[in-house]
Amino acid sequence: MNTMTTGLDALLITAPNDLQPIGEKILARQRITREEGIQLFEKGTLPYLGALANHVRESLHGHRTYFNRNFHIEPTNVCVFTCQFCSYSRLYAHRDEGWELTQRQMLDIVRSYDGKPVTEVHIVGGVHPKMNLEFFTELLQKIKAHRPGLHIKGFTAVELDYMFRKAKLTVEEGMKKLHAAGLDSMPGGGAEIFHPDVRNIICADKVDAEGWLKIHEAAHREGMHTNATMLYGHIETYAHRIDHMDRLRELQDRTGGFNTFIPLKFRNKDNDMSHVPESSIIEDMKLYAVARLYMDNFPHLKAYWPMLGRQNAQLSLSFGVNDLDGTIDDTTKIYSMAGSEEQTPSLSTAQLVTLIRQAGREPVERDTLYNEIRNYKDVDPDGTDLDGIPTDASLN
């Protein structure tokens, strides 16, 4: 038995009696139940949960921590929906307060990365009543014509549900159309919290849990991988969190199409839930740990560093997380407008490598599908190999 397992065994002995069998199941790689997941939230101490989650993380990935070189395009923040937690959107009647990018403007953004080693463009925005399925299929085709090798990850299930209904297409028909036009994968946004007791309060007018899951299942059946998210730290309970993760786990059992699970921290700046306090860093780390323990069929757990902040993202790497997203290059406003830690989110490759190394982990650049592009483990830390910047570059 290795030292890590021996240490975990010692920790199990000191855990509350009703948590010891759960820890033993996890070490034996057995699936935990809904009730056991709730118990971990309610009774698990941070050291206990962190040690178990880190054990699972290192069993899957060792010290490897992934990132990619990406940029975002947000076509618009004009939206037909009025989610209570959203600080980003503007109604169509007030579109003069927001932005609406044309196809030409979005292609100009893509062209601005010509010659740069980005591998992914992430396209997501508000649900604009005038930006329909044809508009976006044309955009996808033009991006692929300009840069065929660029992976396009685009559109939340909320956006797609609206597009498909307006086009009078089934989910399967709409997904085939987008895939043929150049869509390669989907992000996980719009999931929020699945349980209707919460969803009917915070985002009652957009696609429900069943619709969200149906769209992702259709994408998986079409041969595309997707991500999954959960918005946490507002009015939901531990039981609501486990219900959400359980529905995702069930779909993953059927399709295997999810790449990664991404918990998203609720931020209370400039929205209709500003009276709701934000979760503590202790609660954040507990959430990451339980997610890693419960989502046993998800290969990856991602912390979105602009939302958490750089130091907290480093900390999450000891609580089950093995992915920190990408360079982003200050191309997203969705979370900065809600008061995220990073108001101008951009890190060079060198800075991301440094951030990961400072946490005692091994930086690995990946593509969207987690194919390894480069392992930075053995790069000379005093060199100027990364973007022409020393690998110990300041994170400030």
Task: Name every feature range the model reports, one short phrase each.
Residues 37, 69-71, 90, 94, ...:
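Glycine-rich, proline-tolerant flexible connector loops at the mouths of alpha/beta enzymes
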Residues 170-174, 235-249, 308-319:
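Catalytic cores of alpha/beta
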Residues 65-73, 121, 152-156, 186-188, ...:
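Hydrophobic faces of well-ordered beta-strands that scaffold small-molecule active sites
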Residues 110, 136-141, 175-176, 213-216, ...:
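Generic structural signal for well-ordered alpha-helices
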Residues 48-92, 98-124, 186:
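N-terminal pre-triad scaffold of radical SAM enzymes
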Residues 29, 53, 83, 123, ...:
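Conserved, mostly hydrophobic/aromatic
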Residues 1-45, 114, 252-396:
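Auxiliary Fe-S-binding modules of radical SAM enzymes
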